[in-house]
Swiss-Prot record:
GO terms for biological process: protein modification process. It is found in: Cytoplasm. This is Octanoyltransferase. The active site is at residue 172. Catalyzes the transfer of endogenously produced octanoic acid from octanoyl-acyl-carrier-protein onto the lipoyl domains of lipoate-dependent enzymes. Lipoyl-ACP can also act as a substrate although octanoyl-ACP is likely to be the physiological substrate. GO terms for molecular function: lipoyl(octanoyl) transferase activity. Residues 35-210 form the BPL/LPL catalytic domain. It comes from Alkalilimnicola ehrlichii (strain ATCC BAA-1101 / DSM 17681 / MLHE-1). HAMAP family: LipB. The keyword Hydrolase does not apply. In the reaction, the free carboxyl group of octanoic acid is attached via an amide linkage to the epsilon-amino group of a specific lysine residue of lipoyl domains of lipoate-dependent enzymes. Keywords: Acyltransferase, Cytoplasm, Transferase. Belongs to the LipB family.
């Protein structure tokens, strides 16, 4: 059986943090891990920034304007982070949990799917484009990096984020992809409550998709 997430994954609520600094801290934490390093789940938001994954192409950034663009080492294409978005970064030793990359992606998607189901909202994942969708509109994005068997980067959920910056890119490399947010879906959006709810759903999904689970 996998360890209990409520005792063996430390949840850190970090508030608003610069993207580059957070990325650097994730890499440092991963590189310095040892056999006894605890797993952590970071809950954070970022000032406005576009991030370009390893598969990303600059032509998908249509008009960044004053918003900085950061080329990162996560998988995937281009996305936007900004205030009003909750970002979860699972810093996990995947072997402890019996997770592979695909099953961790599924766990992160299920985090949002299960949260929305609690509000009576049907959502789904797509095989061709990781993330969570409500009637074809993307409400959450997933992008990961695994190094030395350990994960970083993660899941971004649109709560009441300004959607205009998404119009300046092809989200996740898909021209015309529509984006939505929890506010427009009728989900009550007290931010601190949603942070805690998403963290709990994520911990539960890690167990479900880990050893002997749904992976």
């Amino acid at each position: 059986m996998p360890p209990s997430p409520l005792t063996d994954i430390q949840v850190r609520y970090l508030g608003r943090r610069d993207y580059r600094e957070t990325w650097s801290a994730m890499r440092r934490y991963t590189d310095e891990r040892g056999p006894d390093t605890p797993d952590q789940l970071w809950v954070v938001s970022h000032p406005p920034v576009y991030t370009l994954g390893q598969a990303g192409r600059r032509e998908h950034i249509l008009d960044p304007g004053e918003i900085p663009v950061v080329e990162t080492d996560r998988g995937g294409q281009v996305t936007y982070h900004g205030p009003g978005q909750i970002v979860l970064y699972p810093l996990l030793d995947l072997r402890r949990w019996g997770l592979g990359v695909r099953s961790l992606v599924s766990a992160l998607e299920h985090t949002v799917i299960s949260l929305l189901a609690g509000y009576g909202i049907a959502s789904e994942a797509r095989d061709d484009a990781p993330g969570v969708y409500v009637e074809g509109r993307k409400v959450a994005s997933v992008g990961l990096r695994v190094r030395r068997g350990c994960s970083y980067h993660g899941l971004a959920v649109n709560v009441d984020v300004d959607l205009e910056p998404f119009l300046r890119i092809n989200p996740c490399g898909y021209p015309g992809l529509e984006v939505t947010r929890l506010l427009d879906l009728g989900v009550p959006t007290p931010y601190e409550r949603l942070e805690a709810d998403l963290a709990l759903h994520c911990l539960e999904a890690i167990v479900e998709y880990g050893n002997g689970g749904a992976a």
